[in-house]
Swiss-Prot record:
Mg(2+) 2 binds at residue 1031. It comes from Mycobacterium sp. (strain KMS). One of its GO terms (cellular component) is plasma membrane. One of its GO terms (biological process) is lysyl-tRNA aminoacylation. Gene3D superfamilies: Bira Bifunctional Protein, Domain 2, Nucleic acid-binding proteins. GO terms for molecular function: ATP binding; DNA binding; lysine-tRNA ligase activity; magnesium ion binding; phosphatidylglycerol lysyltransferase activity; tRNA binding. This is Lysylphosphatidylglycerol biosynthesis bifunctional protein LysX.
Amino acid sequence: MTLTSPPRTRADSRYSWVPAAAGWTVGVIATLSLIASVSPLVRWIIRVPREFVDDYIFNFPDTSFAWAFVLALLAGALAARKRIAWWILLLYMVAAAGWNVADLLTGDESVVDEMGEVIGLAFHLAAVAFLLLARPLFWARVRRGALFKAAGVLAAGMAVGVLVGWGLLELFPGDLERDYRLAYAANRVFAFAGVDPDAFDGQHPHVVVNALLGLFGALALMAAAIVLFQSQRSENALTGEDESAIRGLLELYGKNDSLGYFATRRDKSVVFAPNGRAAITYRVEVGVCLASGDPVGDPKAWPQAIDAWLALCGTYGWAPGVMGASVGGAEAFRAAGLSAIQLGDEAILLPDSFRLSGPDMRAVRQAVTRARRAGVTVRIRRHRELSPEQMAEVIAHADAWRDTETERGFSMALGRLGDPADSDCLLVEAVQGGNGGQERSDPGDGTVVAMLSLVPWGSNGASLDVMRRSPQSPNGTIELMVSELCMQAEDIGVTRISLNFAMFRSAFEQGAQLGAGPVARLWRWLLVFFSRWWQLETLYRSNMKYQPQWVPRYACYEDARLIPRVGVASVIAEGFLVLPFSRRNKQHTGHHTSAPQDLVASGVLHHDGTAPDMSGLRTDTADDEPPRLPEQVRVRMAKLKALQADGVDAYPVGRPPSHTAAAAVDSPDDVELDVAGRVLRIRDYGGVLFAQLRDWSGEVQLLLDNSTLEQGSTADFTAAIDLGDLIAATGTMGYSKNGTRSLLVRHWRLTGKCLRPLPDKWKGLTDQEARVRARYVDLAVNTEARDLIRARSGVLHAIRDTLYHKGFLEVETPILQQIHGGANARPFLTHINAYDLDLYLRIAPELYLKRLCVGGVERVFELGRAFRNEGVDFSHNPEFTLLEAYQAHADYHVWIDGCRELIQNAAMAANGEHVFLRPRDDGVLEPVDISGPWTVKTVHEAVSEALGEHIDAATELPTLRKLADAAGIPYLTHWDEGAVVLEMYEHLVEDRTQKPTFYKDFPTSVSPLTRPHRSIAGVAERWDLVAWGVELGTAYSELTDPVEQRRRLQAQSLLAAGGDPEAMELDEDFLQAMEYAMPPTGGLGMGVDRVVMLITGRSIRETLPFPLARPR
């Protein structure tokens, strides 16, 4: 049978309701006939309408199981749009109409009978008309020769029934005479007792024999109906070319589905998308076309493949069904009109994160230990590494250890071992009594006691196909093989492993939870009960112990009433019910290639089913639709192709220019020079062309004149060059006619083709979000963005130079840290697979720098990145540049002048003078002088000024709370005096500060790493530098007392354990280092991004080259 699909009739045809209506009408009669056959009450209730329908419209006997069965088959066939059912119903309606017409013409009927016959005739004519109009909608075929086969079955059944009935009448004649017995049997079996009983002189046999005679006829009729309406079987499976095409699609897109390789199972049929870029494999069982897993191939072509598959189902009257679809596949099938229900979950192991340690893996760990103690080792090989003799032994083991007579599986099993086309499959063997081989592929000299075979999942995955173990294998053998496979995954190039499928996993899990409802518990109980035969719970638990990632799998169906039928088809397909003449596990059984003829004719496919020539397949399955690109991009791409066709290298190797643009403008006229940069403007005046060229130093005008160009013309320049292109030009400096200094170009070359247009040449990028996301474009067209990059670089250079001149050493300390400390902030968490260890991105380098101080590094600093998982606004970025510096034998007073000098030198480097740039109300930036000393205040003094009430370190907590309430400052009830003062400081002082000011002597309780004040109790030697509401830096007289340091960090660790995400953890290594004694030290921490922000007058996002942006 050729599986090419004719186009389906449009579903929105105005007569699309006819098949369903015909099926429902006949189905209602069949149902009522069946119920009336067993219920006298129903038979009495429907007697009047039944007799009317039976007399004038449709044969509707009061009791007939056979007729009800036949009508039910006819109704199903009509609903399935089978053409033979259409013919039967049409001919019946024509015959019934003719019968009514004949009765009307006789004129012997009563008025009531004539009215009934007129109504019946009208119904028949209407039915005939609608059936004729809807004829194209009945496209489904039945099996070839079904009509003749049904007639033969009916004739044979009737003949056997008559002969057997004749024999019964001879044995049990009753009062029936011998001469009547054969005729009586024929009347009861063949004519359904249509002959008047008076013809037999009132004689009749025993009632049981009489019933059996009628049953024989009914059985013959039912058998004929079954044969007549039976759906077409799929007699075509994979050919070599089909399998080769599928393997090619798996090479290109196999990473998407762990079950994709099972599409090469050879007892499946296949239907391809018209362009060959996707395919669906399936089997037909009990009239269900059962697809396995997701479509194979390009997800963009899945809809076309699904349409072709549904068209095929419609052509032959198959009910569509899908087993084992992923989320993406189920969505695609649902978009095509099917419904989806979750079957269960697939267990996925990620070797990078697989560990035997931890309480959750205790059962696996113990099982592995038992197996190893029993002398079991594991070896892993690709199938191609096995000799034919070794593979024969593997197949023998698989057959011997199988616990069923036949191989099971359909959607999640390959059904073969040892095929040369499957050379990339993995074989994992458990070997007992030997060394298991010194190398991974060494067979060793032991006895194989278990095996796993896994098929490829893309280029870096493996999906379990076969799992076998000897009855004599030690406990834990399977666990050992799975664990070793994960441990050696990197060596064999595997990053993901698909294990068994756990059906109804969520039901087992939810039904066992505390507080599960009665329905969930009952459903779980039923599954556990049936697991005695089907191992549902065993599969779930065998997978669950590995702590896998559960990936849902779905079954899809067209209509809810078809779920049982799809389920039966699945049971048959999976091998739980084996039918005669099954083609399971055979070699290529296909008679007709289903792959698109263009693909077959290309010659890239292989007749033996091996993978095709991939370069040819990529060409033959290329997307016919070009990518959707803006018009200007398409124009530039066309120019690029034209240049490449002419032999022009649009992206050549670099060659340094002799001058920058700025240097070229200042060069003498008679010096030949080279410049390179980006073209920003082009003005073409025919034979003369002007182009504005920009590099990092500035801009220079290019003048191209046809009379001076040594090669090409200005027309060649405009044909090849677009705004934004990178070019190099050679010539001498001169002047244009209007006196503009220009480079008189003699020849030029393209150094980089820009494929996307630049923004407006006058406005540039005006949207701030666009400037952040496309900083490279902003830098290319916006001189202000370049100035900010220069300013930032100048600030960093000035800070380093200032510290270098003071004798400081620059160091680098770890960014990945096991304990977050050095500041109170929420950290970012990451994980290192090599040590299976959670790590933090550092929030500050302080604790490591202090270790260096303990070691004798007296002046040290680090200028690097820190990370804090906090908010994002004009002054905060999760990733930022932080300066921390420590000077031995100094205190926090030393750093007041040191910090001011650093910032003033940075301002000089960026702005040329000691100024910050501040925006006015109209947005224009104006300089603000920051030279000279800066104001210094204590925290309590500043808060007192803001409150208008005096407070100090001795002010009690109730008084502070009362003042906070009066000022509208929120606080938490568990805060101490220091925390309340700090909250008032942040709201009343820090936010309102303008000129740079040092606020010193903070409460001790909010300064855990700072030494207590030398003369004032309750405060610590710490200052914060604030300017225009932004904290720029902080400095401490560092706490060097290791005992006090331990006490404070222990208090912080208690807060962290209590759920405070910003509290520091206890760093025992740091505390141990401090016990070796650190000299009296003054430490400085400064946010460089904020300093740049105030120096340039911009937000922090503008001053960072690439700030973190919210995903689109």
